[in-house]
UniProtKB/Swiss-Prot annotation:
HAMAP family (UniProt xref): UxuA
Its biological purpose: Catalyzes the dehydration of D-mannonate.
Keywords tagged on the record: Iron, Lyase, Manganese
Keyword Ribosomal protein included in the entry's annotation: no
Bridged cysteine pairs (disulfide): none
Organism name: Salmonella gallinarum (strain 287/91 / NCTC 13346)
Lineage, top ranks: Bacteria, Pseudomonadati, Pseudomonadota, Gammaproteobacteria, Enterobacterales
Annotated InterPro entries: Man_deHydtase, Xyl_isomerase-like_sf
Pathway given in the UniProt record: Carbohydrate metabolism; pentose and glucuronate interconversion
Recorded family membership: Belongs to the mannonate dehydratase family.
Cofactor: Fe(2+); Mn(2+)
EC number annotated for this UniProt entry: 4.2.1.8
Protein name: Mannonate dehydratase
GO BP annotations listed: D-glucuronate catabolic process
EC class of the enzyme, as a word: lyase
Amino acid sequence: MKQTWRWYGPNDPVTLSDVRQAGATGVVTALHHIPNGEIWSIDEIQKRKAIVEEAGLEWSVVESVPIHEDIKTHTGQYDLWIKNYQQTLSNLAQCGIYTVCYNFMPVLDWTRTDLEYVLPDGSKALRFDQIEFAAFELHILKRPGAEADYTAEEIAQAERRFATMSEEDKARLTRNIIAGLPGAEEGYTLDQFRQHLATYKDIDKAKLREHFAYFLKAIIPVADEVGVRMAVHPDDPPRPILGLPRIVSTIEDMQWMVETVNSMANGFTMCTGSYGVRADNDLVDMIKQFGPRIYFTHLRSTLREENPKTFHEAAHLHGDVDMYEVVKAIVEEEHRRKAEGSDDLIPMRPDHGHQMLDDLKKKTNPGYSAIGRLKGLAEVRGVELAIQRAFFSK
């Protein structure tokens, strides 16, 4: 695997020098300062690429080129935004950047309820609490029809939880859910959030798939022509939330994508922490079935709690993800490619490290502190080395 590291640009508290010292050789970044839908010019791409290369690193993957909400709802200027997206892909290819991670999650990107969940060892992790999320939906957002998405027991627990919350607790929960997490290009006030949710009132899973298919049929041929590989990121969490459909959550969704546009430019990001939240997702089977189309991987683990819809981010080698078997399947795919004459390594980044040690005293991007990811990268690197030596050394 090619070892990479997500970097949020010049304002990231983790520097490129830190990235290089961590042992990564590739950088995963994006032009976050450019508004959603606007073209990434060659000049802007080259400026960022030069910064990365001056640090002795390579810009390996774009994460992400965001998809404008008009495209997801198939309203407004969606065709203009698609044309801009096509041009951005062409510009990236002209600059020698050929792997693009993206997602098709409506309104919100990845979602958590607690950004400072304290683990028994004193480090902090990200957590999604199903009951707190229900309390937000039912008693703060007050989304019409939200009761239908929860069991009677969850509704009762949410009411009890809400009754114990201070105003500060309510504000923090609201902020965590709607203000935008790292990598998300959108942040909302509560009223703006309600308005954006309303734009999806007539969009179910089938309709959102129609809109995604329209996007894929417009984008993938351009990506194919210029040599860019599109790697869709799964929904996080991988199930419907807030009354919104989710359409990249299961192996069936992956198969639908391939059948919709059967081009090798139409590929996947294997995010084990997103897919792995669902107990019915067999990560190794996903890799084996769609290995040739996996162009990027995020390696992390989550741990489901008593309510299986509640989870927190575990250490990289613990939790519900069998990281050994996942890494072994990825390495096997790389060796399959090598046997066919390709030296195409899969870029991997350690995803969402715990906030720990000295980082507990620093201001960090949630999930993206340095030391936790350094630990995760070192652990995964060791797993890969052991697999390479045990199964593939001559």
